[in-house]
Amino acid sequence: ALDFLDPTDTCGRGTLPTGQAADLMTLKDGREVHVTMIDAAIPSVFVAAAGIGGDTRAHPAKIDANAMLMAQLEEIRRRASVAMGLAPDAEAATLQIATPKVAMVGPASCYEDLAGTQHAPQAQDLQIRMISGGQAHRAVPMTGTLALACAAIVENSVVAGCIAKGADPLNLRIGTPSGIVTVGATRDPVTGAIGAIRILRTQRRLMDGHIYVSLPAAPVLPQPN
């Protein structure tokens, strides 16, 4: 397990840069969608997949091929960039593709990952499909996972609204295109601020071995007569 301490407010405008757990965003086609904009590990904006015709069970290639959906997600990302104070206007946000990250979230449901493994709803607490650099990510960036964990414990956030009842906030099971990721966030018991995020990662030994170091020769002591 990896713990990330004090992960929020990376840009100096607070955990919730707009001051709201969820904001109503009006798109250029007149559609209104609720989004959660959060600055934790990396500035991110989350939208419910159902609100924009998306599907969190879909493989990344299918999401990439849906030009209308990708255009909507990019519009949401640009508008969030301005609302979060990361860019002065939408044109500037176009050039700043790394942040904020934009992601669709949805409730747990049966899906098949990229390796062909089936995941039952009971094995997850929610699902995510994140866009990174203009493409649907084949898993989910670690920073995006950390942001999701923080948004999950913000009452009335879009993410919180997708989580299965009874889910453990310290061990959220996230359905991603490459399988299940477990992550959790904790609050400071005194201030209520998000104090740490924990993520479980796999590991394997890459190598082991020995290093031989030469030691200086021991001094020769004079022999008694």
Residue locations for each model-derived region?
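Non-transmembrane, aqueous-exposed alpha-helical and coiled segments at domain scale
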Residues: A1-N225
